[in-house]
């Protein structure tokens, strides 16, 4: 068990790591020459502006919004840095688009891509499982109707796991998962009150109970429970109701993850177990350079007065 628990968290980036501290957030990037640079990343926080949003069972949704905004900004920054190293001459068509529309066309492409991504996620994780179960009921009869939520929930988990397995075969994603490992190991090293060196970080565990991967699996499992209370079998109505219930799932999942990170007992270990298993897919052993980047980002966000220590 760790000697202390910190509120500092992180996120793996493209050839880098973001560490999120109580006062500031810092990203560390590695270039092809092995040099490490750090850069502060900030976005307006709803929770800092409105303290009531920090209350239990309210903070989960707004914490997720803040995390997504900060994460997207850091990912965009890391993509720009990676793209800058591999910059290619733009085609004539790209030059024409830039001359004609400027940044507007890129903003439009990003917006359309985001909308299509959300639509695909809703289709795969909400609509498709409901349609498939209706088809299964047509073949077997109404006797299995009580298993609807279990079937849909397990199918969502299978789809999500398969998606992670497939993308993990991509070299860029594999490296990102290794940076994820560097993030976890560095946080564990700090929580165990050890000097932040590559040698000490390397010895730490890869799997952390407060990981975002664990949060995703926990939300999928909570979705099964919520599904029992949705009476509709129509795929459109069922999908709509599940989307309405997302804030509830996020809020409960966030509080459970906070408990698992703060306390170590039989109950929290049971809650954390599925997420820790899933991290075997999303958290891999890092290289020394990745650990050095994580250490650089971590040192930059550790406050002097210890206000990050929550236990």
Give the ranges of each region predicted by the language model.
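Divalent-cation
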Residues: 1-83, 90
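Transmembrane alpha-helical segments and their cytosolic interface motifs
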Residues: 105-123, 204-229
